[in-house]
From Swiss-Prot:
Transmembrane segments: none annotated. SMART domains: DEXDc, HELICc. It comes from Mycoplasma mycoides subsp. mycoides SC (strain CCUG 32753 / NCTC 10114 / PG1). The UvrABC repair system catalyzes the recognition and processing of DNA lesions. A damage recognition complex composed of 2 UvrA and 2 UvrB subunits scans DNA for abnormalities. Upon binding of the UvrA(2)B(2) complex to a putative damaged site, the DNA wraps around one UvrB monomer. DNA wrap is dependent on ATP binding by UvrB and probably causes local melting of the DNA helix, facilitating insertion of UvrB beta-hairpin between the DNA strands. Then UvrB probes one DNA strand for the presence of a lesion. Forms a heterotetramer with UvrA during the search for lesions. Interacts with UvrC in an incision complex. GO terms for molecular function: ATP binding; ATP hydrolysis activity; DNA binding; excinuclease ABC activity. This is UvrABC system protein B. Signal peptide: none annotated. The beta-hairpin motif is involved in DNA binding. The keyword Hydrolase does not apply. Residues 35-423 form the Helicase ATP-binding domain. It holds the Pfam family ResIII. It is found in: Cytoplasm.
Length: 671
């Protein structure tokens, strides 16, 4: 991130930078979406087949309307992918990333049946925390801001008015006492560190104050004072300490997203005490003396910490008091940081919307138990994610994107969707065949051999783990190079299997759920769906369409459904695929397009050889201390590789490395 981007610029325009022009049916999709936005329609659905360039279409919409934009994805990996794609297309604008800032998070919980209290355990990721702060700051200072977020965007943040009131603008010639500046820095979450330039820290030597902001990498500000007046402001590189620029003004934002307002701290603590007195009376009247004692002890300890330091462990549980919200009032969230005219894009809406719906009830159920048994005050219930109705009340105009939109979003638009099913590569939706289950395994083996002759690969999806294990073992007995992809595999192992499938180390991968990200491999030309006619999540219409789409990147893409009857879901999926395929064929014929398999480079390995050796070494070490040191060394190596992958815009590898780091951190914590 360039240092200039931390400066206040009120109303920049988006500039889409790309060597591509809209092709296929992207133009008509862009026109229809644009028209609906101009007409102020709240809901739109972009039904985009796999590989048709939905992100590119959305980028054109954002650029045309110059509105702040929120893009919500259902997990960190997809959010990271979208972030890097949009960042590449909008290099001169603010593209931000907002996900959970924890590498590891175990929420506070109590299990009454076992009388087991589980304390909150977490490991914060400073890099992600920095990116969250950057997103908040950008939304409050820049019109040309795109934030790519997970559902973390729906969890509680500080009131944006309170947060922005903590901004301080420093100018050359401004009168300010050194102690006033240092006091503001401490109250805004900065920590003093005269030795190391850490994110969210400051140093003070004589009349020179150096501030390392918490929202941008490798940059710090040197404020030189003379006789209670700012004499000069310089931007410096935090690593080399070299001067980057001499500036006249800078806006410094808080180092944390939750800042306790000092002038209101006394009132906040009194309000917490009043609630405590009321709740203790309730518990004592119900003869819950143990719960009352527990609550009093815990809350008073938190109050002492709040009054002394302006902070306490689990401060988020007092967020309604910090924000002066009434009981039941919704929390402030990232959406409150947007201006009054922003656009929302819900990616993979058939997955993301159900996830948003479920968050509130899951969170409330856990916290009700904590309140009932005296671990938390009732106001802790108001530290929560938005419920679905609240989310809907905050979004202005929204585009739902999916290859298989859900019934909810389809009903919102009366099934009048904007279609985008022509691929720039000319690739057609896969052919589909239905075959009887009699001798199905022999038939699959024959298909595997045919694909192997063409140097192509095969996916096989079953309904149960047992079926996958048995089928994998049987194929191995037949000397077929096969791997089993299951949920217990660690991120790195899963990625290495898929990489080896592409290389030809394996010819087949067997699994239960082949709907996860990272499975769109151009070498895979056949997907075999066992028990295709059975009812359930993995064999409903949307899952079948998504599974068929696993082979849509190969010109010979084909799906074989093994079933003795044709279920309604099968019938709908086949009809929809054939409908799309017909449109695609007609378009190719009209424009003389010859479909071709997507070309995608195969990386030699996700990990460097050095990191592989260190990881293998760690597994063999029995001494606990030495093992922890080796794991930490591996984590440090992986962080370097992850940052390098991010710089090279290899977001798939960067995401895999990040997940591997999280797994190793968890392993280190349990040793």
């Amino acid at each position: 991130m360039l240092w200039e981007k931390v400066m206040f610029i009120a109303n920049n325009k988006y500039k889409l930078v790309t060597k591509y022009k809209p092709s296929g049916d992207q133009n008509q999709a862009i026109e229809k979406l644009n028209k609906a936005i101009i007409e102020n329609k709240k809901h739109q659905v972009l039904l985009g087949a796999t590989g048709t360039g939905k992100t590119f279409t959305i980028a054109n919409i954002i650029a045309k309307h110059n509105k702040q934009a929120l893009v919500i994805a259902h997990n960190k990996t997809l959010a990271m992918q979208l972030y890097y794609e949009l960042k590449e297309m909008f290099p001169e604008n603010r593209v931000e990333y907002f996900v959970s800032n924890f590498d590891f998070f175990q929420p506070e919980a109590y299990i009454p049946s076992k009388d087991l209290y589980i304390d909150k355990d977490s490991r914060q990721n400073m890099e992600l925390d920095m990116m969250r702060l950057s997103a908040c700051n950008a939304l409050l200072t820049r019109n040309d801001t795109i934030v790519v977020a997970s559902v973390a965007a729906l969890f509680a943040l500080q009131n944006p008015l309170e947060y922005s009131s903590a901004f301080i603008e420093l100018k050359v010639g401004q009168k300010i006492k050194r102690n006033e500046l240092l006091t503001w820095l401490v109250r805004s979450g900065y920590t003093r560190n005269d030795i190391e330039n850490q994110l969210g820290s400051f140093s003070a030597k004589g009349d020179v104050v150096k501030i390392v902001p918490g929202w941008v990498n490798n940059i710090m500000f040197r404020i030189s004072l003379f006789d209670d007046e700012i004499e000069s402001i310089h931007t410096l590189n935090t690593i080399t300490n070299s001067i980057l620029d001499n500036i006249t003004t800078v806006t410094i934002h808080p180092a944390q997203s939750y800042i306790t307002p000092q002038d209101k701290l006394k009132t906040i603590c009194n309000n917490i005490r009043n609630e405590l007195v009321q709740r203790l009376a309730e518990l004592q009247s119900e003869n819950k003396l143990l719960e009352a004692q527990r609550l009093e002890q815990r809350t008073k300890y938190d109050l002492e910490s709040l009054e002394e330091f302006g902070f306490c462990s689990g401060i988020e549980n007092y967020s309604s008091h910090l924000d002066f919200r009434s009981k039941g009032q919704r929390p402030y969230v990232l959406l409150d940081y947007f201006n009054n005219d922003f656009i929302t894009i819900v990616d993979e809406s058939h997955i993301t919307l159900p996830q948003i719906r479920g968050m509130y009830n899951t969170d409330r159920s856990r916290k009700l138990t904590l309140v009932e048994y005296g671990f938390r005050l009732p106001s802790a219930l108001d530290n929560r994610p938005l419920n679905f109705d609240e989310f809907n009340s905050l979004i202005k105009q929204v585009i739902y994107t999916s290859a298989t939109p859900g019934d909810y979003e389809l009903d919102l638009v009366n099934h009048q969707v904007v279609q985008q099913i022509i691929r720039p590569t000319g690739l057609l939706d896969p052919q589909i065949e239905i075959r009887k289950t009699t001798n199905q395994i022999d038939d699959i083996i024959n298909e595997i051999h045919l694909r192997k002759l063409q140097n192509e690969r095969v996916f096989i999806t079953t309904l149960t783990i047992r079926m996958s294990e048995d089928l994998t073992a049987f194929l191995q007995e037949k000397n077929i190079k096969v791997a089993y992809l299951h949920s217990e595999l660690k991120t790195l192992e899963r990625s290495e299997i898929l990489n080896d499938l592409r290389k030809g180390v394996y010819d087949v991968v067997v699994g239960v759920n082949l709907l996860r990200e990272g499975l769109d491999l151009p070498e895979v030309s056949l997907v075999c769906i066992l028990d295709a006619d059975k009812q359930g999540f993995l064999r409903n219409y949307r899952s079948l369409i998504q599974t068929i789409g696993r082979v849509a990147r190969n010109v010979n893409g084909k799906a074989i459904m093994y079933a003795d009857t044709v279920s309604q879901a099968m019938d709908e999926a086949i009809k929809e695929t054939n409908r799309r395929r017909k449109i695609q064929e007609e378009f190719n014929k009209k424009h003389n397009i010859v479909p071709k398999t997507i070309s995608k480079a195969i990386s030699e390995s996700i990990l460097s050889e050095q990191t592989k050796k260190t990881l293998a070494k760690a597994k063999k070490i029995k001494d606990k201390k030495q093992k922890l040191q080796t794991i930490q060394q591996t984590i440090d190596n992986l962080r370097q590789e992850m940052l390098q992958a991010a710089k090279e815009l290899d977001f798939e590898r960067a995401a895999i490395l990040r997940d591997t780091i999280i797994e190793l951190e968890n392993e280190k914590n349990t040793n």
